[in-house]
């Protein structure tokens, strides 16, 4: 799997420029004009992981296959979008399909780039985006809750349970709070996720700053960081211009460019890390002569379900997992050395896969 991240924001905040850079494509027509992105553009990137390169070298793998991250560039929101202003509800549904939402906020001053509300205020921009998503959630949830409540009153047990779940985000949305604030029990979570509420998604605030502020941020991004800390959201500081230049460079020129900009790594890496932390994702590996491959799972996933990410047959016929920790695999110079050192473990169906595990699944056909 990997994960799917929706990129949202007001028009002209650098959203499509950032999308182009992150996915190294020119799929989104980045122009100084609101609503130039009408259909969501979808781009995939390989998730950088130095461990995978090391494993491929040690395991003498012919091919390296990273896990994938999907970005969905969703058309520019404006105030009133939930009521059909701007592009309206046509694109809001695209956010329902993503795992996390990146709010791109304009944290730079440039008189040549218009702002849809003629001001530079990233917190106000975030409020506009969040409000429109909350209003869309409230409208859809009230319609569904009304129908479910009627069924619940007839004594339908399933309807009663579902209505109890619906009530929690409904009350919050009526108070102007996002659905992600709802306190759900583990038993309620599947039903809550199935509601696919826009504001139930974890949020990453992406502060698009001027080039000179890419390393340390600026006064605007500091405001966003304070809000994110209070909300438990993530923040990534990025200069879309720098990312755009970086994406067009030859591989051998990239390190020098980053050093010149005072950066240790590209913004993509920081955004991926923020997303993984928000969604509580971990990576395990499979290594062989043919390929070294990374697989993304949710923290806490057990071995059979982790195997199922490769193929459903692996999960159905799961017998055991031959498991070596990443450090032990490298220290042993591969599977044979790790096994000789007593570092290979045979794990059963209750084993919780750890980040960095190198695994070989045994299964019955």
Provide a role label for each language-model segment.
Residues 1-114, 142-143, 148:
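Conserved G1/Walker A P-loop phosphate-binding module
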Residues 2-8, 13, 19, 142, ...:
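C-terminal-of-GTPase-core extension/linker across diverse P-loop GTPases
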Residues 3, 14-20, 48-60, 88-112, ...:
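Phosphate-binding glycine-rich loops and adjacent basic patches that engage nucleotide phosphates
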Residues 6, 35, 40-43, 50-52, ...:
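Short capping/connector residues at structural and topological boundaries
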Residues 22, 84-87, 116-119, 218-222, ...:
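Short, glycine/charged-enriched secondary-structure capping and boundary segments
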Residues 26-34, 41-43, 51-54, 83, ...:
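Glycine-rich, flexible loop/turn motifs
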Residues 35, 49-52, 65-71, 85-98, ...:
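Amphipathic alpha-helical transducer elements in NTP-driven molecular machines
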Residues 43-48, 75-85, 96-157, 172-185, ...:
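Conserved Switch II/interswitch segment of TRAFAC-class P-loop GTPases
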